[in-house]
Amino acid sequence: SGSQDLEPSSGLVTDAIADSESEDDEDLDVPIPSRFDRRVSVCAETYNPDEEEEDTDPRVIHPKTDQQRCRLQEACKDILLFKNLDQEQLSQVLDAMFERTVKVDEHVIDQRDDGDNFYVIERGTYDILVTKDNQTRSVGQYDNHGSFGELALMY
């Protein structure tokens, strides 16, 4: 398993709250099922969202111009994580976002680093690099749109 190094060719990336760890499909070892294997149980406490205490943390708001807000909203409109948000929820997400300009060859996230932001690409080309066995290879590219670092939103 490995994280991705994201190295822009050029561009602008927008942060909102993350880290990017993606599993390399070649690393997955799927055991062959045996009829003699024991069944594994999973237990968890019941969760009732109505019983959850209200969030008392202060809301994070980064000031931005109307133009910046429109650009952020446009960059986020096709991101699956945000598709089912109502206008108020999306507004809160946009409030928490801030812009970050990225220079050519700057690493946005490095493999094995703790990520602390979720990134939304407004423009630019970003290479996704993975290092395995001391060899770095390109496994993908973002071109003028996309997002990465979803795991940071969970923590």
Swiss-Prot record:
Location relative to the cell: Cytoplasm; Cell membrane
InterPro entries, sorted: cAMP-dep_PK_reg_su-like, cNMP-bd_dom, cNMP-bd_dom_sf, RmlC-like_jellyroll
Dimerization and phosphorylation: region residues: 1-81
An example molecular function term from Gene Ontology annotations: protein kinase A catalytic subunit binding
GO BP terms in the entry: adenylate cyclase-activating G protein-coupled receptor signaling pathway; negative regulation of cAMP-dependent protein kinase activity; positive regulation of meiotic cell cycle process involved in oocyte maturation; regulation of meiotic cell cycle process involved in oocyte maturation
Acidic residues bias (residue ranges): 18-29
Family matches, as Gene3D superfamilies: Jelly Rolls (2.60.120.10)
PTM statement from Swiss-Prot or TrEMBL: Phosphorylated by the activated catalytic chain.
Binding site for 3',5'-cyclic AMP: 82-155
CC terms in the record's Gene Ontology section: cAMP-dependent protein kinase complex; cytoplasm; cytosol; germinal vesicle; plasma membrane
Residue list for modification Phosphoserine: S20, S22, S41
Broad class of where this protein is predominantly found: cytoplasm
Endpoints of the signal sequence: none
Main function: Regulatory subunit of the cAMP-dependent protein kinases involved in cAMP signaling in cells. Type II regulatory chains mediate membrane association by binding to anchoring proteins, including the MAP2 kinase.
Family under the similarity heading: Belongs to the cAMP-dependent kinase regulatory chain family.
Name this protein carries in UniProt: cAMP-dependent protein kinase type II-alpha regulatory subunit
Species of provenance: Sus scrofa (Pig)
